[in-house]
């Protein structure tokens, strides 16, 4: 069993190492620019990528930074209304060929929205549509069929959380900002110098 986890860590390490540095730095910069110009960062995904996007949004919001989740499926049923002029959209899709993802990519392009595709596929319909891409490598998903969203979602989580931390730094977020937004639970108590049960 331990061997399985060691193999997973090797896969994740190799995948994270495949992050294209130039594109990553440009993406971070454009996220910061969007926030500084009154825009917001929108993370969009479907299926098992939904909680990954929501975690990123939650981390951003806890720092007082404007981020929203846009479900790839419901976007074209009115939710596109949240996308404004100065926003940036992070579109998560492992294969990039899901009909909903391709459809949303097309509509975002028509609107002139700054869109980034975070994908593990270099050749996909979405990649043909979206100009800005961060293409990642993934050896396998870690299950016996190499089909379940497992390692890919872990990589997305690592990358998006890393992005949130870096964006927070560049936006000058201080611990006091986080403290104001997170008064509850053990974290809130710790920030107030209190014991949770006192």
Task: List each language-model region with its residue ranges.
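Catalytic cores of large soluble enzymes that bind and process phosphate-bearing ligands
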Residues: 1-4, 19, 48, 151, ...
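An N-terminal, well-structured beta->alpha segment
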Residues: 1-37
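Glycine-rich phosphate-binding loops that contact phosphosugars or nucleotide phosphates
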Residues: 39-171
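Internal, active-site/partner-interface "lid" segment
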Residues: 128, 142-143, 168-198
């Amino acid at each position: 069993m331990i061997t399985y986890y060691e193999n997973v860590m090797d896969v994740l390490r190799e995948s994270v190492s495949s992050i294209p540095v130039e594109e990553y730095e440009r993406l971070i910069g454009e996220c910061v620019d969007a926030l500084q110009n009154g825009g917001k960062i929108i993370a969009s995904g479907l299926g098992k990528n939904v909680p990954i996007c929501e975690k990123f949004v939650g981390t951003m919001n806890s720092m007082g930074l404007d981020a929203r989740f846009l479900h790839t499926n419901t976007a074209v049923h009115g939710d596109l209304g949240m996308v404004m002029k100065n926003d940036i959209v992070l579109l998560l899709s492992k294969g990039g060929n899901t009909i909903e993802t391709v459809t949303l990519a097309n509509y975002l392009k028509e609107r002139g929205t700054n869109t980034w595709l975070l994908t593990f596929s270099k050749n996909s319909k979405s990649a043909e549509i979206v100009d800005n891409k961060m293409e990642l490598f993934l050896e396998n998903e870690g299950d016996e069929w190499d089909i379940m969203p497992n390692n890919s979602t872990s990589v997305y989580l690592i990358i998006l959380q890393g992005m949130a931390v870096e964006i927070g730094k560049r936006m000058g977020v201080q611990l006091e900002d986080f403290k104001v937004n997170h008064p509850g639970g053990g974290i809130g108590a710790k920030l107030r110098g209190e014991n949770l049960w006192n």
